């Protein structure tokens, strides 16, 4: 199962989402779990080095070859943290995806970036949006949820703005974050109907 975490825009929560999804998979013990850091910035690897995830192997390398090799593992759950943009690594990962998780924020230019990511995703691959760092109870969030609903884009999760979730390698993964991303993981790995 290849879960690709992607958005053409940077700074939307891709790394946080990828790390939490891999941690959830590792805790479920459903076979080998591989977390691929395909972003040249190396934030996923930095996070992993500071706080290794139980049951999760890290693969570093922002190259098409490295990503492809990692995603060819038959029995593994592979979570790929892609770089922003539409580069060859992103396209290669999306081309091998079994599910695409698209982290985004509420408001701003986010919808056009998500639509660009969806346009690069193969039609037969399930994809869903996760609104990260959401300010609960705001008009921006309500409008964003309404937008995705009207466009029939699956909303796989809303992750509220919490320092404990988005603090990166500075602290351990939060239980709240693990619970929220467990729901995203369940949607990403659901059998198509």
Each model region followed by its residue ranges:
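P-loop/Walker-type NTP enzyme "switch/lid" segment
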Residues: 2-12, 19-92, 166-174
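Short, aromatic/basic amphipathic alpha-helical patches
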Residues: 46-51, 141-151
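Beta-strand-loop-alpha "switch" segments that mediate conformational coupling across diverse proteins
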Residues: 135-136, 145-175, 188-192
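Conserved C-terminal guanine-recognition region of P-loop GTPase G domains, centered on the G4
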Residues: 112-133
């Amino acid at each position: 199962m290849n879960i690709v975490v992607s958005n053409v825009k940077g700074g939307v929560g891709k790394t946080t989402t990828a790390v939490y999804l891999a941690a959830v998979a590792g805790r479920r013990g459903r076979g080998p779990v591989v977390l691929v850091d395909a972003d040249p910035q190396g934030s996923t690897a930095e996070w992993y080095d500071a706080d290794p995830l139980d049951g999760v192997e890290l693969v570093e390398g922002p190259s098409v070859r490295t990503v492809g090799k990692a995603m060819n593992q038959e029995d593994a759950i592979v979570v790929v943290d892609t770089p922003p943009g539409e580069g060859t690594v992103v396209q290669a990962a999306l081309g091998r995806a079994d599910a695409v998780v698209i982290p985004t924020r509420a408001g701003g230019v986010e919808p056009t970036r998500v639509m660009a990511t969806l346009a690069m995703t193969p039609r037969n691959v399930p994809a869903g949006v996760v609104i990260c760092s959401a300010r609960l109870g705001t008009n921006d969030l309500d409008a964003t949820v309404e937008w995705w609903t009207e466009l029939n884009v699956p909303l796989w999760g809303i992750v509220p703005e919490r320092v404990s979730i988005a603090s990166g390698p500075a602290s351990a993964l939060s239980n709240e974050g693990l619970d929220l991303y467990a729901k995203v993981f369940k949607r990403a790995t659901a059998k198509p109907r």
